[in-house]
Amino acid sequence: MTVFELIRQEIMADPMNSAYTQNEIPPLFKASREARLVIVGQAPGRKAEETRLFWNDLSGDRLREWMGISRDLFYSTDRIAQLPMDFYYPGKAASAGDVPPRKGFAEKWHPLLIKEMPAIETIILIGSYAQKYYLDKRCGKNLTETVRDFEKYLPDHLPLVHPSPLNLGWLKRNQWYEKEVIPALRVIVNKNLLD
């Protein structure tokens, strides 16, 4: 049994996750000693939880397009780890989108998993929850400012806006993103996946 399987069992045994474990819903994350990139998003969506595939929706299609890689490579490579801020679908919010990831979840499990991935080059931080946790006081005053200043976080972290169709307006207002941030993302991906 690998260390990642042991951690998975610990997560399932944690009382914080008992409702999921009782309903036979395992945590959704992917970790590997060969991982060079870690993608940290908010939490699995309903479809991801049902299909057991991260980013298995329109947001994932856009993310893979931004990265410049195929769906097959995205799911098959051990060089990409997936550590959402919560490993379980938190439910639908009253407004658009999903309920935020549970407080304390990433703090408890991410350090244990990251410690076991010695080859990590860059942690890709998708959305404000991931950015606030990993960048903490180094974050800008809002997501736009944090992402605009992406170069100051490299090479350890790369903040991205969420690739959701709900963010099309943001992308139109911030055209610098696809001209500056996406090329930087592709350089990182090429260096770590395709060499």
Label each region the model flagged.
Residues M1-L193:
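A polyanion-binding, active-site-adjacent surface
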